[in-house]
Amino acid sequence: KCIQMDRVYRAERPQKGRLREFVQCDIDIIGSDSTDSEIELILTTTKALDAIGMKNYKVKINDRRLLRAVLISFGFKEEELDSVCITFDKMDKVGLDGVKEELEGKEFDKQAIDKFVQFLSKAGTAQNIKLDSVKDMLEDKTPAESIENIIDTVNKLTGGRYEVVFDLSLVRVQGYYTGTVFEVESLD
């Protein structure tokens, strides 16, 4: 287990909400692929937020393996997934039409794009997509079951003090994110 907090820097152009320099706290559990580690990280994070007086928030969770499996089920190729994820990560900024237009501009398979866009438009927003509907699409249900276990366990252990939700749009485009990802969203 490792915890560190310090100034970090982005090697990119600063933009709204993305400062070049900022303070970041990393909490890592190295060498374990157990969902217990993910649960511990979420509980540690929320305990720290509670300690500094943050009370009204929700935890959003996804899994890169699950997202990749969903994209492959629509017909995208393995070697296209990073590029598709980069585009999908822009959805809150450019909307579904913008995502579709960018995917078409990258000349991905039209049928894969149409299936993906139809799936997203049925739900209204990517945040409205239910884990069960994603799970039903997949041959390997392990990542979806892992997220279910994490959500159920955290909810039981915290007595529902805050909401823990599946969010397919939580993308994280950096290659070093390979499994479960989560973020906390303030509701204030």
Protein language model features and the residues they cover:
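Positively charged, Gly/Ser-enriched RNA/tRNA-binding surfaces
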Residues: 2-55, 65, 99-188
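Glycine-rich, mobile lid/loop segments that gate access to catalytic sites or pores
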Residues: 59-70
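A generic structural motif
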Residues: 60-61, 85, 167-168
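Short coil/turn linker and secondary-structure boundary residues
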Residues: 62, 76-79, 91-94, 108-111, ...
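Short Asp/Glu-rich motifs
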Residues: 68, 90, 176
